[in-house]
């Protein structure tokens, strides 16, 4: 983990966008690949997704500890679907950042 003074809100937003993208992709992959895997094998993917959600929870906890005055809208940094209408400005910003992150994978 980087020092507290270097953990800017923008660092959290970027990490949140990346985590939301990862969870979205893994959720879709789990559904799609479950058609060719046994239930036991699919359960392994589901457990990994659960682990990632726990990591998001810890990251969110750190964010609110570092920035205690953030509004409740900032729960959207680490949580929420990427393929729906944004719920608020923070959600919209994170969705756009996730799109940029995805595009960077193809550069």
Give names to the regions the model predicted.
Residues 2-32, 36:
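N-terminal acidic leader/helix
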Residues 3-5, 39-54, 85, 96-106:
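Function-determining surface determinants
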Residues 6, 10, 32, 43, ...:
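Acidic-enriched, low-complexity/disordered segments with a strong bias for Aspartate over Glutamate
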Residues 13-27, 43-57, 80-84:
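Generic structural signal for well-ordered, non-transmembrane alpha-helical segments
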Residues 24-38, 54-68:
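Charged/polar positions within long, soluble alpha-helices
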Residues 67-107:
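Amphipathic alpha-helical binding modules
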